[in-house]
């Protein structure tokens, strides 16, 4: 069962679901909460390695990833980021999300931005029960024009689905969870698998 706007407001007021900063009422509509672009990002360098062999050693994968992904960069509040056509970049949400063990979150891009060619997540739109932290967005510009992105703009929407029972192994309690308590823009940790 997906939570309605009334349910979301109730879960937030009872602190069963935590979103910081606390969303204004006008951001909670239908079955979603609008979320915003944070000011932290990482971009991908062009032509620093020819490929990443995902079947290679963990050490080689980590080395290759470090060659292609920038360090985390922090923008000032109104400083723009230019996402060129065909470019991939990682951003964090402004909001920090905490989900209880009986709720799964779903991230969806905004239709108005998709119509300009902006994909805000490349396939990873599930937020596991027990999650705590920022959400990293994988931006891809599939359009023909450079998109100018500024921290604080509405960038995506979250919806929430109630599970039949709380999960036994929530995300932040599992030792192998690569992104638990994520703060900022954490790049791929596929080499930890």
From Swiss-Prot:
Q: Which GO terms describe its biological process?
A: dUMP biosynthetic process; dUTP biosynthetic process; nucleobase-containing small molecule interconversion
Keyword tags = Hydrolase, Nucleotide metabolism, Nucleotide-binding
Enzyme superclass (EC) = hydrolase
Recorded catalytic activity of this chain's protein:
dCTP + H2O + H(+) = dUTP + NH4(+)
The record, for Pfam families, names: DCD
InterPro entries, alphabetized = dCTP_deaminase (IPR011962), dUTPase-like_sf (IPR036157), dUTPase_trimeric (IPR033704)
In alphabetical order, the GO MF annotations are:
dCTP deaminase activity; nucleotide binding
Q: Where is the active site?
A: 138
Q: In which pathway does it act?
A: Pyrimidine metabolism; dUMP biosynthesis; dUMP from dCTP (dUTP route): step 1/2
The UniProt record lists the EC number as 3.5.4.13
Q: Does the keyword Hydrolase apply?
A: yes
Sites where the protein binds dCTP: 110-115, 128, 136-138, 171, 178, 182
Entries under PANTHER family matching the protein: DCTP DEAMINASE (PTHR42680:SF3)
Relate the assembly described in the record.
Homotrimer.
Read off the NCBIfam families from this record.
Answer: dCTP_deam (TIGR02274)
Task performed by this protein:
Catalyzes the deamination of dCTP to dUTP.
Similarity annotation: Belongs to the dCTP deaminase family.
**Protein's name in the database:** dCTP deaminase
Gene name per UniProt: dcd
């Amino acid at each position: 069962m997906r939570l309605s706007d009334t349910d979301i407001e109730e879960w937030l007021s009872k602190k069963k679901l935590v979103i910081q900063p606390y969303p204004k009422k006008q951001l909670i509509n239908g079955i979603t909460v609008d979320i915003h672009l944070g000011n932290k990002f990482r971009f991908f360098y062009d032509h620093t390695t020819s490929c990443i062999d995902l079947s290679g050693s963990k050490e080689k994968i980590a080395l290759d990833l470090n060659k292609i992904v920038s360090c985390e960069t922090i923008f000032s509040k109104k400083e723009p980021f230019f996402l060129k056509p065909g470019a991939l970049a990682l951003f964090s949400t402004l909001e920090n999300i905490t989900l209880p063990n009986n709720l799964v979150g779903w991230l969806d891009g905004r239709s108005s931005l998709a119509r300009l060619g902006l994909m805000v997540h490349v396939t990873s739109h599930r937020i596991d029960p027990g999650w705590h932290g920022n959400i990293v967005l994988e931006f891809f510009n599939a359009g023909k024009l450079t998109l100018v992105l500024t921290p604080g703009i509405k960038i995506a929407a979250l919806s929430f689905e109630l599970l039949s029972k709380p999960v036994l192994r929530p995300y932040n309690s599992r030792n192998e969870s690569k992104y638990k308590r994520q703060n900022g823009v954490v790049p791929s940790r596929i080499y930890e698998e």
